[in-house]
Amino acid sequence: MSLPRFFGLSAALLSTASMAQTPISLDQAMAHPDWIGTPIESAWWSADSKSVFYRQKLTGSPVRATYTLGGQGGQATRIENSAWAQLDEAGQAFDAARTRAVFIRQGDVFMRSLGNGALTQITRSAENEDAPQFSADGGSVLFQRGNDWFAWRASGLIEPVLQLKAEADPDKKPPVSAASAHELRLIATLARQKDEREAMNKDRDSRRLADASSAKPATYLGKDVVISGSTLSPNGRYAFVITTEKGADEGQSGKMPKYVTESGFEEFETVRTRVGRNMPLAQKLWLVEVATQSVRELDFSALPGIATDPLAELRKVQKLEPLKGQRALRIINQGDNSGAGTMHWSADGTQLAVQIRAIDNKDRWLGKVDFANAKLISVHRLTDPAWINWNFNDFGFLPGNRFWYLSEQSGYSHLYVGDGKAAKALTSGAFEASSVQWNGAGTLAYFLCNRKWPGDYEVCRINADGSGL
């Protein structure tokens, strides 16, 4: 649970507890929950950390208002619509020196200079931008629009860095059939036209490569995939793309009848696929070299236990075919991971950590990419014969490319720094650590912990060497 959600829930629980002494009628129990209190639904810091913003439902209204509060407390002030143009939003990404921050507001990219407070609007488009970040050298702001990635420079120029297409490469030569070879050999006109076409394409490509003002050509992943997501390295050298098989059976969505409607007629709401009817679609991860548009599938075979079937005995009892090859995997999306990201780059763009989950939910791996060999090398495996928790899977990089992660390997969620067997547990004991936030220098970790008893959560702090909890 994130800090904002936790504090909002706490407020609601406290309000409920304070009213527990008063008998509650059935009418009140079934009434709109505004009488309990309206909790804070989300909260975030301004880019300069001098104030806090939060959103709260207005009593008796579906509208959510945004408020600001000084970092030292005091009286909260509601932000009027006219002041939204200067508002910092959540999800800020900072440059290496932490002098600038970028964020998304209303689908557009903004940059805040922490020195003088200047706010620069980078995009104003009908499409939604996402995932803003600074390039490794700090000279560009990178962001995503749909399946494509763009770079903005201080000159105001926005250029495409990576255009991803789930299509066949139109310039890729198809295999020459025997009939085609026969025609080209016998009909000189066809052979000449083919040679001229290839010469024109080669000249076009060479001019495009030589012209620094020209946009990069698109990267084609083939017509048999559907793009599910992607990430671009801060140095702009690599990208990774998540795909599923095109045409794969996702299962029939359920139809939920609604009988109480404004129209007076029954209506149907489309809901998720019924549990057990179809497994989630297996995913693949592709390594793209941006400069050359070369695409390689990432090899997962080095993950321990990837080819071991934890359901082998059940398959045998049911007289089903045994598992052949590797287990089906997913690169967990943020919704499935309780809001935690699933692919994290080091600040210099030289390392990428990825979270992979078996579709049978018995294993979760954290791995680092071997770029030269297009392989994922396991850093940490969490395995359970029952079920791997959706929560407590946060991970990332600290300054100096130090790796950190949460794991329930001890039975409780704890914070670790380091790779594999060299990882050091910063926290331990009969409590859980969650919602980790590091300071900019990577020397202090702040997190939720419940050391006193399971329902009593506090904000805890610990040094990166494990001291000072």
Question: Residue spans of the language-model regions?
Answer:
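Beta-propeller folds
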Residues: 8-12, 20-469
